[in-house]
């Protein structure tokens, strides 16, 4: 650990704010908990990796002290709460041009990847996210051939796509090479996805990459992006979804990470509403991931004009794909029953989004 302060307080250095691009707080904040970000300076609105007395927690230190004690602010994505993990050892900490990257060994969830103070994955429960975000769309269409991953620098989504033998090309556009390098070193079970010869890696901005892509190139696009804070807000706005739709074939599918139903109902509504203006059909599914805020994460699934897509009933079931169940490693979370169950929404969320999801 670094930087002992006072009574066993150990804090990592704060970021320099490069990822904000100077524009993060000037964008319109969606009508959800992100409003909390607007009341603190830009550098402080970013989350920083903090280890206090051997525990990692998502609140982060603001510069300076108050009354002799470090001042902590809630993460703007989920004000008023944070998940903590006991840290056995910090394995890596550095700043890329875009974000702070932290890897530590936890007491209960194995190794943990943290970006700008937000847990991205743990060895124990990554399967509940990686498997669902990949197979929900790919098992909903017949024989996908060209697939694009936006983000996904840890390689987990690539690992899951590689189970599908029909896929011929897997493009991945990741802006931060450090995430890829760190994953290859500390998370080889995920980064094995990069070893697939079908993978074509592109380092750069996804929006720019999509603008240069031929129209109708992809059967499926999977957006494994960071939370919509600062520059990433553009990834939940209409122009980006229009760019995604343009890159899909008729009947092509999109699966986009879509936050927590317990914390971001308004943001989910905003995303579904925007997608309804752009795509033929829109659905919402979810998965249980213990180390994500509130323990759940959602996905918006969309299809373009063309052959109808029945997302709720997999027509390309993973169980019938040759070797898919054990390719690279055995599936731990996803199966066809979990696929169908993922679209069952609790009553409170169904009330909120029913009119938006209606055909």
From Swiss-Prot:
Record's signal peptide: none
Pathway entry: Amine and polyamine biosynthesis; spermine biosynthesis; spermine from spermidine: step 1/1
List of residues binding spermidine: 129, 154
InterPro entries in the cross-refs: PABS, PABS_CS, SAM-dependent_MTases_sf, Spermi_synthase, Spermi_synthase_euk, Spermidine_synt_N, Spermidine_synt_N_sf
Annotated family: Belongs to the spermidine/spermine synthase family.
Subunit structure of this chain's protein: Heterodimer. Component of a multiprotein complex. Interacts with SPDSYN1 and SPDSYN2.
Name under which the protein is recorded: Spermine synthase
Gene source species: Arabidopsis thaliana (Mouse-ear cress)
